[in-house]
Design a protein with these regions (language model features):
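Active-site proximal loops enriched in glycine and acidic residues that flank catalytic Cys/His/Asp
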Residues: 239, 315, 460-464, 487-489, ...
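Flexible, D/E/H-enriched segments
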Residues: 257-259, 267-386
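Terminal substrate-recognition subdomain of acyl/acetyltransferases
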Residues: 336-416, 420, 425-441, 491-492, ...
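A conserved beta-strand-loop-helix scaffold within acyl/acetyltransferase catalytic domains
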Residues: 411-496
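Conserved acetyl-CoA-binding loop-helix of GNAT-fold acetyltransferases
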Residues: 496-509
Length: 584
């Protein structure tokens, strides 16, 4: 868990230098502004958020509260390095709540209790070495209800709930990092039992989010007020298996996981992989179970939190971010690698994955993995509750193809499209008003489809365009029709955050036009850097203010297709109400 604290009031020249050095090297100007705007108000108020760490990982340090788990096998080296990362996060304004996992500890409840208490104290001592206020081990703020194990909803608090918030809130007020063993006290008898760390994290999340109910004991008014002033901001899951695997990604894992859209795909893939795993390879099935638990944990916790909250799933070693310098040589010929940014700090500053999920495979920067080998992209997954993606027509039913004469086709005036919201999205994103009548007429007969993210927070309109030398009155060879991205829009409030642009772009290149698409942009458009990173190539059209981009493989080797693409990007007529076509 993570809590934004009043660490800023302790700002000094050394802290200023520390912050500036990070902002200058790790994030964009927009990221820096967003971070400062979000955390500067913490001079006057505190907020709370969660982070969790699973098997073989320990508490994390950022200025927010994070629940984390650790096991007896957790190396002391990682305790120290992760503790240092948590302290750095706290310096940046985010305090952590650490949940210590007792999974993998054998023996009776009393024996397991002794072991987990020792783990909690070890973690707290590691934090004390790096943090002025240090850590505090809390006893048993959790109570086990009579119906333990029966609850199925993250909103239900009858299985495990928080009965003593005062010690937790006091430690946060004192800017100490709470370390909580995953132990609960039974409701009807004075007995202590180990509980599932995921359940402990959910119980704390419910309490700090104001969602603990169903007849649980009422806190006094002062504590209720304090709880209302908190905000669960981040969940961190540290697990040696790392981020969520993805067979259909060049990196082999999800860099960004849109839980609303991709959770079922994740569970289906991991379940199938487990069923197909060789009996001689039990490690694969075990790892898949870890990934499933991590994904489920992220989904349940984020369902309780604001849509701006997110979960980071990474390894303890990556969270510790300790790389021997000699590991920078990956052994990959002609490719240089770089040391990875600490995913906890990078995510706090940017709320983005270390590398964008919409980059083509050739653009992922090789990095040194946790085991010292080179890999594409990061081993960390950033998960958000995300948003549903609507694609019309649905490519799962039939791949997008140019419509044949007489076939029914999608139109923007269809009941399945909310045209007023679509127009508002375009107007807001471009800062210009669309000439709706002109635009509808232009795309009426050549609309390929549309992509809508969430409640029209982002979207794309794609068309089939005829090359310049085609007779407008005659049908064109379908093979020469150009797949064209006509409009790509994200609401201004969602630009640069939340992954909306990546979600829409991924849907376009993976589901709608996997074999390639082109688009154009003004040569002086600041978004062109983003386009360059995601395209297979670009070309500045002479005598015009347009630059052409495409994702089509080997386009430059096909002269006819290249000229067709170029002619479309030259000739598509803008449909803006201000008629300032000369600007384009």
């Amino acid at each position: 868990m993570s809590v934004r604290t009043t660490a800023f009031k302790k700002a000094s020249s050394s802290f200023h230098d520390f912050l500036v050095s990070i902002l200058e090297t790790s994030v964009t100007k927009r990221d820096a502004r967003a971070y400062i705007n979000k955390f500067a108000p913490l001079l006057e108020r505190k907020r709370i958020g969660f982070k969790q760490q699973t098997s073989k990982s320990v508490a994390q340090k950022d200025g927010q509260d994070e629940p984390t788990e650790s096991t007896p096998q957790q190396p002391l080296y990682h305790d120290s390095r992760v503790a240092k990362s948590l302290s750095a996060l706290k310096t940046l304004g985010l305090i952590s709540i650490v949940v210590v996992d007792c999974d993998g500890v054998d023996g009776s409840d009393s024996e397991r209790r002794r072991v987990i208490d020792a783990q909690a104290n070890r973690i707290a001592e590691a934090i004390d070495c790096f943090d002025e206020e240090g850590a505090v081990v809390l006893g048993t703020p959790l109570t086990i209800g009579d119906s333990v194990g029966k609850g199925t909803s993250p909103y239900v608090s009858e299985d495990l709930f928080v009965t003593d918030s005062s010690s937790l809130l006091q430690s946060l007020q004192d800017e100490k990092i709470p370390v909580i063993p995953s132990v609960g006290e039974t409701e009807q008898s004075i007995a202590y039992k180990c509980v599932d760390a995921n359940d402990a994290v959910l119980a704390l999340t419910r309490q700090l989010s104001g969602l603990q109910f169903l007849g649980q004991p009422m806190e006094d008014k002062h504590i209720v007020q304090q709880l209302k002033a908190t905000e669960v901001y981040r969940l961190i899951i540290l697990d040696p298996v790392g981020g969520v695997p993805a067979n259909n990604r060049a990196t082999g894992r999800y860099m960004f996981l849109n839980l609303e859209q991709e959770y079922e795909e994740v569970t289906r893939s991991l379940t199938e992989s487990t069923l197909n795993s060789d009996s001689k390879n039990p490690g694969t099935a075990q790892e898949n179970q870890h990934h499933l638990r991590n994904s489920q944990m992220a989904r349940k916790a984020l369902s309780l939190l604001p849509s701006t909250s997110s979960a980071i799933i990474t390894t303890p070693k990556d969270a510790a971010n300790e790389r021997p310098q000699e590991e920078a040589d990956s052994g990959w010929p002609y490719v240089s690698t770089r040391r990875k940014l600490n995913p906890l700090i990078h995510n706090l500053l940017t709320d983005k994955p270390a590398q964008s999920s919409s980059l083509p495979s050739g653009r992922f920067t090789p990095v040194v993995s946790s085991n010292g080998a080179a890999q594409l992209g990061s081993s960390t997954t950033l998960a958000k509750r995300g948003m549903h993606v609507t694609i019309l027509p649905d490519p799962r039913v039939s791949m997008w193809q140019p419509p044949r004469p007489g076939e029914p086709r999608l139109r923007l005036t269809d009941a399945s499209v909310n045209l007023p919201r679509l127009v508002h999205l375009i107007n807001d994103s471009f800062g210009r008003k669309l000439d709706v009548e002109h635009y509808l007429k232009r795309v009426e007969e050549n609309l390929a489809g549309i992509i809508i993210a969430g409640e029209y927070e982002g979207g794309a309109i794609l068309t089939w365009e005829k090359p310049w030398d085609a007779d407008p009155a005659e049908d064109v060879d379908p093979s020469r029709l150009v797949p064209y991205l006509d409009k790509f829009a994200v609401l201004r409030k969602s630009q640069g955050a939340g992954g909306v642009a990546d979600i829409v772009f991924n849907a376009m290149v993976r589901d709608c036009f996997p074999y390639g698409v082109c688009w154009r942009s003004r040569k002086d458009n600041p978004v062109n850097k983003w386009y360059h990173e995601r395209s297979a190539g670009s070309h500045k059209i002479p005598d015009m203010n347009w630059a052409m981009f495409w994702t089509t493989p080997d386009l430059a080797l096909d002269e006819q297709k290249f000229q067709d693409y170029k002619s479309v990007c030259r000739s598509v007529e803008p449909s803006w109400a201000d008629k300032k076509h000369i600007v384009d």
